[in-house]
Amino acid sequence: MANILKKLYNADKRELKRFEKIADQVESYADQMAALSDEELQAKTPEFRSRIEKGESLDDLLPEAFAVSREASKRVLGLYPFRVQILGGIALHRGNIAEMMTGEGKTLTATMPVYLNALSGKGVHVVTVNEYLASRDETEMGQLYRWLGLTVGLNVSTMSPEEKRKAYACDVTYSTNSELGFDYLRDNMVVYKEQMVQRPLNYAIIDEVDSILIDEARTPLIISGEAEQANADYVRADRFVKKLVEDKSDNDADDDEDHGDYKIDWPTKTISLTRTGIQKACDHFGLKNLYDVENQKLVHHIDQALRANYIMLKDIDYVVQDGEVLIVDSFTGRVMEGRRFSDGLHQAIEAKEGVKIQEESQTQATITYQNYFRMYQKLSGMTGTAKTEEEEFREIYNMEVITIPTNRPVIRQDMPDLLYPTLDSKFKAVVDEIKERHAKGQPILVGTVSIESSERLSHMLDKEHIPHAVLNAKNHAKEAAIIMNAGQRGAVTIATNMAGRGTDIKLGPGVKELGGLAVIGTERHESRRIDNQLRGRSGRQGDPGYTRFYLSLEDDLMKRFGGDRVKDFLDRLSDNDDDKVIESRLITRQVESAQKRVEGNNYDTRKQTLQYDDVMRIQREIIYKERMQVIDEQQSLKSVLMPMIHRTIDHQVDMFTQGDRSTWRLDSLRDFIVSSLASEEYVDSEIDFKTFTPDALKQQLYQLVEDNYQEKEAALADPEQMLEFEKVVILRVVDEHWTNHIDAMDQLRQSIGLRGYGQLNPLVEYQDSGYNMFEEMISDIEFDVTRLFMKAQIRNNLSR
């Protein structure tokens, strides 16, 4: 282990040495840039752009571009980046993480790589954790980029698509991580290309990168809508299908008569309306053509009502308990609590059984931050604390963590932890130290891990008449103002972990002489990184400072991992005195080893999440790419549509003509052709079910499709309208099936753990089942596109 750490440390040093040489080059241009007039310095931007067009790379331009950005910062912002900030900027440009201590000027560091990468014209996204920081940085740093001739945009959730499109078209765009992810998902739900807002994802610099890529990595971004089903539609469809009669006649295509309204094919558990059933549906719902594009949702409700009433069996497939429909596991016979059939089938069964139909919001699109940010051409980030998660950044995001040296030596005092037997004795000691330091005017920042702890401490300070501010990470703008004053003489501030992050605490007059900012931690967090963030609030830019953590045996982390060893150790030293305190490096080491265990567990969980998510990621990319192809098409989608219809014909004909001719399911084949491809008249006059061969029938049906396509082209007359019709058909079907598939995959994932009991690897099972479900969905999409396209009657009022 020591060898590995040594290697990593040396790799860090080697990388920094390389950066030092580049920083020398940047600094060598300083005098030259300082000698230029404002106009000459501003003229560098178009000069760099034309050099890029002629083939120079961004790496070639780096020393000069960084020097230009640096000189412009001095003139516009009154700030001149230090050498260590140049090193940080190089790390960011290289697609790595620059670990820079609090107060070392991360925002200014980012200006150099942002300027350099924006010259390419492909867009740079500067990502922050909340909209207050995004808008603050866009206002402050935007002046610099605009002065240099770049365009700057701010992307926030309240904007219209038009405003967002403008923001994304800028050279530099400030945004939050969540808004970027949601915009990506929304872009892949549009029906016209002009509705999209994002450009291809080029380069992102993430501020507080550990918070976004580690702490929130597993948070899925979800866009959901009211599941399209109106409950009344399920009831209407249910009432209709309950009146229908099954056609139980044998598979004999010679008999043209329907003997019922629907037919069940038990080997495949499929059910479909016969011609009589289709006519009854048209009469019942007052329609001319059931399979018209406009009636797609109704057809879906009827299909599910048929399955619910005639294929799903009560007490075998499901049970009704306390007015609820519960699924029965077909393998174990057990009731599966909390699970629901997908694709509206559950609601259809609820309608069948007359119980309350549960509203469901349906996930229309979803992605995790891990998968969203991995799509950028180049990704980089800044934070004060990333080294502890170095392995995760390297393995998952292919980013190295480069620790950037501080501009001035750190002289802060980090004291050993103090351990108390109980929470009460610990908080009493915290208040005593606050009183003592407050009395001499030293500013104090107290970190807590929960709102409950903050309120407890606040109450105790009120009793002691010590004025203080409490931050709970709710109001970002107000909290930034409070945090900015937390370094003033006499200030006492209580903050939960994330509150006020991103805002520096600057020391007020006379505070250095009092020992700088005192930071008191009231509990160790399960992640060392969060503790380090709290410590890093003090001692910025070489200022004096003091930090100390107070622990008790009743703290969550100590209860989970400190165990009996620490308790025995404490008992031996404290003689059962509740107020007895132990100050020991051994305790600190014990706590840190507990934290390492938790971090390891959390990393394994995130890694596993990613492995599961990768299954969905691959499927999402396929669907979004196909969707984009449809949206992008300017001429005709015949080349997309025809193969889909041909594959459907092949699949259906093969399915119904397996084995010996005597076992062919001719009735089912005939029903498919009538309900999805042709009129009854055509089937009766043109297809001879006694003598046909499967291959000859396929060719005949291909020709039928070609003729139908040409008829529609002629009816629409305008190629643009034909293209619009094709897009309507494909996008409607794809979107509906994809939404249902997301739901089904989610249900699969929730149930897959149970398969682990059968000595099966749950991940492999999920991959296999997920792949099969995806293939099935593609087949269903092609089937529905076939039926919708072939059966649609052309009218000129298409709406997507």
Swiss-Prot record:
GO molecular function: ATP binding; protein-exporting ATPase activity
Taxonomy of the source species: Bacteria, Bacillati, Bacillota, Bacilli, Lactobacillales
Function: Part of the Sec protein translocase complex. Interacts with the SecYEG preprotein conducting channel. Has a central role in coupling the hydrolysis of ATP to the transfer of proteins into and across the cell membrane, serving as an ATP-driven molecular motor driving the stepwise translocation of polypeptide chains across the membrane.
Top-level class of the enzyme under EC nomenclature: translocase
Localization per Swiss-Prot or TrEMBL: Cell membrane; Cytoplasm
Keyword annotations from UniProtKB, A to Z: ATP-binding, Cell membrane, Cytoplasm, Membrane, Nucleotide-binding, Protein transport, Translocase, Translocation, Transport
SMART domains: SecA_DEAD, SecA_PP_bind
Alphabetized NCBIfam families for the sequence: PRK09200.1, PRK12904.1, secA
Signal sequence interval, chain numbering: none
Recorded name of the encoding gene: secA
Protein name: Protein translocase subunit SecA
Keyword Transport assigned: yes
Catalytic activity, EC: 7.4.2.8
TM helices/strands, residue ranges: none
A GO cellular component entry from the record: plasma membrane
Reaction(s) this enzyme catalyzes, per UniProt: ATP + H2O + cellular proteinSide 1 = ADP + phosphate + cellular proteinSide 2
Organism of this sequence: Lactobacillus delbrueckii subsp. bulgaricus (strain ATCC BAA-365 / Lb-18)
Similarity field: Belongs to the SecA family.
Family matches, as InterPro entries: Helicase_ATP-bd, Helicase_C-like, P-loop_NTPase, SecA, SecA_CS, SecA_DEAD, SecA_motor_DEAD, SecA_preprotein_X-link_dom
Membrane topology value: Peripheral membrane protein
